[in-house]
């Protein structure tokens, strides 16, 4: 299922590695929403302070590596 919230990590980058299926990562920047499609084996970086969420059409598995300290969330 697609995420029901946005999140932001202020203290470090987050590596998002798709290991199975596919996801679309949405990142909120000043110029608008940037969508990045990830298939198995592909990764993206969420920079510190960037609000992000994800859409998942079917099913997917991903690994998230980040500094969780100070993480904020908000409804989508």
Regions inferred by a protein language model and the residue ranges of each:
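A cytosolic small-molecule/anion-sensing beta-strand core signal
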Residues: 19-20, 39, 58
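Conserved short histidine dyad/triad with adjacent acidic residue
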Residues: 1-10
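Glycine- and acidic-residue-biased ligand/ion/polar-headgroup-sensing regions
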Residues: 11-29
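Short acidic-glycine-tyrosine-enriched beta hairpin
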Residues: 29-48
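Double-stranded beta-helix
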Residues: 53-76
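Flexible, glycine-rich phosphate/dinucleotide-binding loops
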Residues: 24, 32, 71
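A generic "binding-loop/recognition-motif" signal
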Residues: 11, 50, 58
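Histidine-centered metal-chelating micro-motifs
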Residues: 3-4, 42-53, 71
């Amino acid at each position: 299922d697609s995420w029901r919230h946005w999140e932001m990590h202020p203290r470090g980058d987050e590596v998002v590695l798709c290991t199975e299926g596919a996801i679309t990562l949405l990142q909120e920047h000043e110029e608008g929403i940037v969508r990045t499609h990830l298939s198995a084996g592909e990764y993206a970086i969420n920079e510190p302070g960037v609000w992000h969420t994800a859409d998942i059409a079917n099913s997917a598995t991903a690994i998230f590596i980040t500094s969780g300290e100070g993480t904020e969330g908000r409804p989508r």
